[in-house]
């Protein structure tokens, strides 16, 4: 895949106007992996969307070490003009920022099922009917800022030791086959494969309703 991107961006760099920004949509390949040898590498970056991209507005912009700040700024302005919500990573990280945050949650969810702490259905409920309700209109920093009388510093003083102890227990997780099979089996019991397409359409309708609500109730 990296080689395909290298070849494609070499063609784009040769054929496109010098002032055009070249952005790649990718979930895990940084711009530095396929643009280093390009004469126009300073105008290349990653614009990482979120699934489904036609409904979720966030776009993560990540340049290579040689990407010109103007290329990122112009891309951010364009995304904002067309109704997206651009965020900018100031340096490359493996998997990009959104995927890293999602990976931490998904890995812990699998660990909890593996260790017999909670069922697949109840883990989903913890996010759907707990964390997700707040996260649909505020991020983790604003959440903790409101969760202690003195804001973030007070939250860290009160809960930092507990959070530190929890994260110390979270060794790297390898998505072992037995746990993956268990999670998949519980999901197929809850939602047969034949119903996935309909459920995906339902998800899209719920996302549209949430977006409409957010437009009517600006934060």
Q: Can you name each region flagged by the protein language model?
A:
Residues 21-91, 95, 99:
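Rossmann-fold dinucleotide-binding core
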Residues 39, 66-70, 104, 118-121, ...:
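Charged, alpha-helix-enriched surfaces in structured cytosolic catalytic cores
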Residues 53-62, 82, 87-115, 125-141:
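Active-site-proximal catalytic alpha-helix in oxidoreductases
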Residues 32-35, 76, 103-111, 124-128, ...:
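Predominant activation on well-ordered alpha-helical scaffold segments within soluble catalytic domains
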Residues 84, 115, 120-219:
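NAD(P)-dependent Rossmann-like dehydrogenase/reductase catalytic/cofactor-binding core
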Residues 1-21, 29:
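Rossmann-like NAD(P)-binding element
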């Amino acid at each position: 895949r990296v080689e395909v991107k290298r070849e494609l961006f070499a063609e784009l760099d040769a054929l496109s106007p010098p002032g055009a920004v070249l952005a790649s949509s990718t979930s895990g390949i940084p711009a530095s992996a396929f643009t280093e040898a390009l004469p126009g590498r300073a105008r290349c970056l990653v614009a990482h969307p979120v699934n489904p991209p036609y409904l979720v507005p966030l776009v993560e912009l990540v340049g290579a070490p040689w990407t010109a700040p103007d290329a990122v700024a112009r891309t951010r302005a364009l995304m904002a003009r067309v109704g997206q919500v651009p965020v900018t990573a100031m340096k490359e990280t493996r998997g990009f920022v959104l995927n890293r945050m999602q990976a931490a949650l998904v890995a812990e969810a699998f660990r909890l099922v593996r260790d017999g702490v909670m069922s697949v259905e109840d883990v989903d409920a913890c996010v759907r009917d707990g964390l997700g309700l707040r996260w649909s209109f505020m991020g983790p920093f604003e959440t903790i800022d409101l969760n202690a009388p003195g804001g973030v510093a007070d939250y860290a003083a009160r809960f930092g030791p507990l959070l530190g102890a929890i994260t110390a227990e979270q060794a790297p997780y390898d998505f072992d086959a037995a746990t993956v099979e268990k999670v998949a089996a519980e999901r197929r019991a809850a939602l047969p494969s034949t119903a996935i397409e309909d459920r995906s359409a339902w998800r899209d309708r719920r996302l549209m309703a949430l977006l409409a609500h957010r437009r009517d109730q600006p934060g």
